[in-house]
Amino acid sequence: MSKKKESVHITLEQRQEDVRRSMIERLVAYRKGLGVSQKEIADALGVSRPNIGRFEKPDYNPTIDMVVKVADQLGLDVEINFIERKDK
Protein backbone atom coordinates (compact mmCIF):
# COMPACT_ATOMS: atom_id res chain seq x y z
CA MET A 1 0.00 0.00 0.00
CA SER A 2 1.37 3.40 -0.92
CA LYS A 3 2.12 5.94 1.80
CA LYS A 4 -0.68 8.21 0.59
CA LYS A 5 -3.29 5.42 0.59
CA GLU A 6 -2.06 4.23 3.98
CA SER A 7 -2.37 7.77 5.36
CA VAL A 8 -5.90 8.15 3.96
CA HIS A 9 -6.82 4.71 5.34
CA ILE A 10 -5.58 5.60 8.81
CA THR A 11 -7.46 8.89 8.68
CA LEU A 12 -10.65 7.08 7.67
CA GLU A 13 -10.23 4.57 10.50
CA GLN A 14 -9.70 7.43 12.95
CA ARG A 15 -12.84 9.20 11.73
CA GLN A 16 -14.82 5.95 12.11
CA GLU A 17 -13.54 5.53 15.65
CA ASP A 18 -14.30 9.17 16.49
CA VAL A 19 -17.92 8.82 15.28
CA ARG A 20 -18.44 5.60 17.26
CA ARG A 21 -16.85 7.01 20.40
CA SER A 22 -18.84 10.26 20.26
CA MET A 23 -22.12 8.44 19.68
CA ILE A 24 -21.57 5.99 22.53
CA GLU A 25 -20.30 8.67 24.93
CA ARG A 26 -23.43 10.74 24.29
CA LEU A 27 -25.77 7.79 24.87
CA VAL A 28 -23.95 6.79 28.07
CA ALA A 29 -24.00 10.36 29.40
CA TYR A 30 -27.71 10.65 28.64
CA ARG A 31 -28.46 7.28 30.28
CA LYS A 32 -26.54 8.26 33.40
CA GLY A 33 -28.20 11.68 33.46
CA LEU A 34 -31.58 9.96 33.57
CA GLY A 35 -30.38 7.71 36.39
CA VAL A 36 -31.04 4.60 34.29
CA SER A 37 -28.79 1.60 34.93
CA GLN A 38 -27.25 -0.71 32.35
CA LYS A 39 -29.37 -3.50 33.86
CA GLU A 40 -32.59 -1.53 33.32
CA ILE A 41 -31.71 -0.99 29.65
CA ALA A 42 -30.70 -4.64 29.27
CA ASP A 43 -33.93 -5.89 30.86
CA ALA A 44 -36.04 -3.62 28.64
CA LEU A 45 -34.25 -4.89 25.53
CA GLY A 46 -34.18 -8.54 26.59
CA VAL A 47 -30.38 -8.75 26.56
CA SER A 48 -27.83 -9.34 29.31
CA ARG A 49 -26.27 -6.50 31.32
CA PRO A 50 -22.80 -7.46 29.99
CA ASN A 51 -24.14 -6.91 26.45
CA ILE A 52 -24.97 -3.32 27.36
CA GLY A 53 -21.57 -2.99 29.05
CA ARG A 54 -19.87 -4.05 25.81
CA PHE A 55 -22.13 -1.71 23.82
CA GLU A 56 -20.94 1.19 25.98
CA LYS A 57 -17.23 0.50 25.48
CA PRO A 58 -15.54 3.04 23.17
CA ASP A 59 -13.97 0.34 20.99
CA TYR A 60 -17.26 -1.50 20.38
CA ASN A 61 -18.76 -1.21 16.89
CA PRO A 62 -22.53 -1.31 17.47
CA THR A 63 -25.10 -1.97 14.79
CA ILE A 64 -27.45 0.85 13.86
CA ASP A 65 -30.29 -1.40 15.04
CA MET A 66 -28.81 -1.61 18.54
CA VAL A 67 -28.13 2.12 18.67
CA VAL A 68 -31.77 2.80 17.76
CA LYS A 69 -33.03 0.29 20.37
CA VAL A 70 -30.94 1.80 23.17
CA ALA A 71 -31.83 5.35 22.13
CA ASP A 72 -35.52 4.41 22.04
CA GLN A 73 -35.33 3.07 25.61
CA LEU A 74 -33.86 6.41 26.65
CA GLY A 75 -36.66 8.33 24.92
CA LEU A 76 -34.42 9.51 22.10
CA ASP A 77 -34.75 9.49 18.34
CA VAL A 78 -31.68 8.89 16.20
CA GLU A 79 -30.85 11.39 13.48
CA ILE A 80 -27.80 11.03 11.27
CA ASN A 81 -26.47 14.10 9.51
CA PHE A 82 -23.96 14.06 6.68
CA ILE A 83 -21.91 17.22 6.55
CA GLU A 84 -19.62 18.09 3.67
CA ARG A 85 -16.00 18.23 4.80
CA LYS A 86 -14.03 21.39 4.22
CA ASP A 87 -10.80 19.46 3.53
CA LYS A 88 -12.00 17.66 0.38
PLM segments and residue spans:
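Recognition helix of helix-turn-helix/homeodomain-like DNA-binding domains
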Residues: 45-61
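DNA major-groove recognition helix of helix-turn-helix/homeodomain DNA-binding modules
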Residues: 65-80
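N-terminal flexible/basic segments that precede or flank functional cores
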Residues: 1-26, 88
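Short, charged recognition helix plus adjacent turn
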Residues: 80-88
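Short basic helix-loop element that most often maps to the first helix and adjoining turn
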Residues: 25-44, 69
